[in-house]
Amino acid sequence: MRSNWIRFLAGVLVSVALVGAFAVTGGMKGGRSTDGLLYQASGLHPDGEMLAISGQTVTCEEYLFWLGMVCDNVTASLPDVDWSAAVTGDGMTFAEYAKTDAVEAAKQHAVVRAWAQQAGVALSDASTLELDAQRQQYVAYYGSEEAYLQQLALMGISEEAYDRILEDQYLYRDLYQAFCTPGSSLYADDATLTDYAAQLGYMGAYVLKLTGDNAETMANDLLERWQAAEDKEKEYALICEELQQTADGIVTLTAVEDDALSDAMSALEIGGMTAVIDPYGEGTSFVVLRTEPDLSAVAETYFDVLWNQKMEEATVVTNSKLYDGVDVGAFYE
């Protein structure tokens, strides 16, 4: 099976995190299909139900696809790997590692599907167009539609299952964009984001960066000018234009310990201003106006927190009869 695993899936990443304990059940379907190399290599029916993750079914076909990817990663570093050899101090073998890591890869995709279903988020029109364009790139790369489908067959995966895996990546992006877009159904309320920002010590600020021999003088002059301006945001934009700098708007960041610029910003009240002269000994000075954090930027990191939480809370149920019967060495060789 090894020579058939052609890795042309740029962007598909398999986590090395190991899966913890999960429930087992004998009530899942074993499947009937006998199509494809995956069945020949494993004896498992592609349409069999290998996993149920947060209500999403993972077929043997999808699981074995991820198992092959994990095995590819292992053999890239250890071409002559002994799948029965221990890889961890507690005796976990390379085969057990590969099987559990394949569960983790499937879990990531299943959690995306479950979250999108719960939130009512479907693949966007833009993502659908990108998927179509990506598929055409694959077809062009392999020379024809027939050649592309042959490559999928060599990988042992159906076009339907492969398309679903690709769709999950774009669906994750659509979830992220919806979550980070003010006004969308997924966007967290301002109070939640404000509390989260306070917990993590996020600060917001308009920042002017000045370099050159007269940076210190310019910083002090611009501070005085900016303080006198009635419309601070408008004045910031005008100064950036005069300095031929990009007006980046509010920068949202967390405090950094023992950092002179960060310390100066942290010391300011909201609306406070200061000039920070050459904090790093490199001749660069800064003028800073402290603001509330940009909540749209806070939402981006809050999404990551919720994603990790959903991954941790995901329920994983395995078809123990099928899972325990997977012989990694025989499957991959």
Predicted regions and their residues:
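Short, low-structural-confidence N-terminal segments
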Residues: 1-96, 100, 263-267, 313-333
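Acidic helix-start/capping segments at beta-turn-to-alpha-helix junctions
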Residues: 84-93, 107, 113, 123-144, ...
